[in-house]
């Protein structure tokens, strides 16, 4: 349980930073005083946490359906297939990761 609490605390911290930054930007651009309530950040954190849990279960189910016990990048890509922007970001990250590993392997053998 300690690890879960640590992850949730980190999500809360990032959520609070994003909300406060956005509030500051709105305050500057619209000349309105925008204040972020801490309970709002708690609510957003809970939504994000629950979404992470659902996503993890879906990714594990895709791997299991493919007859694997280990999650592969294609499971993650399959899970985000309906969000074109996210799919592109993750796919590009995966391709760059493969290229980087190949370069390291080539450099270590020469």
Swiss-Prot record:
Pfam families: CENP-S. GO terms for molecular function: chromatin binding; DNA binding; protein heterodimerization activity. GO terms for biological process: double-strand break repair via synthesis-dependent strand annealing; replication fork processing; resolution of meiotic recombination intermediates. One of its GO terms (cellular component) is FANCM-MHF complex. It is found in: Nucleus. CDD domains: HFD_CENP-S. Its main location: nucleus. Keywords: DNA damage, DNA recombination, DNA repair, DNA-binding, Meiosis, Nucleus. Component of a FANCM-MHF complex that promotes gene conversion at blocked replication forks, probably by reversal of the stalled fork. FANCM-MHF promotes non-crossover recombination. The MHF histone-fold complex is a heterotetramer of 2 mhf1-mhf2 heterodimers. Component of the inner kinetochore constitutive centromere-associated network (CCAN) (also known as central kinetochore Sim4 complex in fission yeast), which is composed of at least cnl2, cnp3, cnp20, fta1, fta2, fta3, fta4, fta6, fta7, mal2, mhf1, mhf2, mis6, mis15, mis17, sim4 and wip1. Belongs to the TAF9 family. CENP-S/MHF1 subfamily. This is Inner kinetochore subunit mhf1. It comes from Schizosaccharomyces pombe (strain 972 / ATCC 24843). The gene is mhf1.
């Amino acid at each position: 349980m300690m690890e879960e609490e640590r992850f949730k605390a980190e999500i809360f911290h990032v959520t609070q930073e994003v909300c406060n930054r956005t509030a500051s930007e709105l305050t500057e651009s619209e000349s309105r005083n925008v204040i972020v309530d801490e309970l709002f950040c708690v609510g957003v954190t809970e939504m994000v946490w629950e979404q992470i849990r659902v996503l993890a279960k879906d990714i594990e189910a895709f791997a299991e359906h493919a007859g694997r016990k280990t999650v592969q990048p294609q499971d993650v890509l399959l899970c985000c297939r309906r969000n074109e922007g996210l799919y592109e970001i993750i796919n590009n990250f995966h391709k760059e990761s493969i290229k980087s590993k190949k370069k390291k392997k080539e450099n270590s053998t020469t």
